[in-house]
Amino acid sequence: MIKVGLIGYGKAGQAVAEVLKEDPRFELVWVAKRNPWPEDQPLPLGLPVFAMSQGDFGEWLDAHPVDALVDFSDADTIHLYGEEVRKRHLTLVSAVSAYSDESLAYARSLGEQARVLCSPNITLGTNFLILSARMLRGIAPIADGEILEQHFREKPEMSGTARKIAKTLDLDHDRITSLRLGGIVGLHEVIFGFPHQTVRITHESIRREAFGTGAAFALGELSKQPYGFYTFDDLLMTMIREQLTQPETRQQP
């Protein structure tokens, strides 16, 4: 069983905590957030809570050791715990979507002494969408490409996942259409226009628990890898290669 600490306890973090708590492969040991937990509120899932802004993270880990960290906080928090990841060789799955070039380079450096995965969208389906779209783009580069992203109306910025799709497909950001409607958790669609046909690749997160199942998938697969910096694509490609090298199973007549 892998002991896990969860950093970040917003709406997504809360959903992730519920999934990890129920997965028999993991033991969710604690939750960390930037500010102290309100004293008049019950602890999340009965777990201890660490305030990143006020305590010593190394001392916290000494008292509450874990094997892995899952980060659903913000782009700056990695600098508060990164050296402990390096020193203790902790597995890190980060779903932060807006790392600066400096912070992303720092995350890559942690991969020299630990297993580190960074993915702006941690859902399995979205990452399979990106991989599939990249493959089709490589097969048929002449096709027109457009990206549609839909999210809840309170989300102000362009989706980090949409930006990643655009970068992967070598599309300008003006080829991204953003819609903000009601309570949509997240929908991404890549549309390829051919002269006589259209291909649409779509993924929709119905509940935020999809982030939790994606993080659990990443943790399970990352634990099998050597130290290094990984993307979700790396994990998927490893599994696809394994599938392609397996003998084809034929149904007997």
Label each region the model flagged:
Residues 28, 49, 92-93, 116-118:
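Hydrophobic beta-strand scaffold residues
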Residues 58-68, 72-94, 106:
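Rossmann-fold NAD(P) dinucleotide-binding segment
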Residues 55-56, 97-101, 121-122:
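Short, acidic/turn-prone active-site loops that include or flank metal/cofactor-
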Residues 128-142:
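Rossmann-like NAD(P)H-binding beta-loop-alpha module
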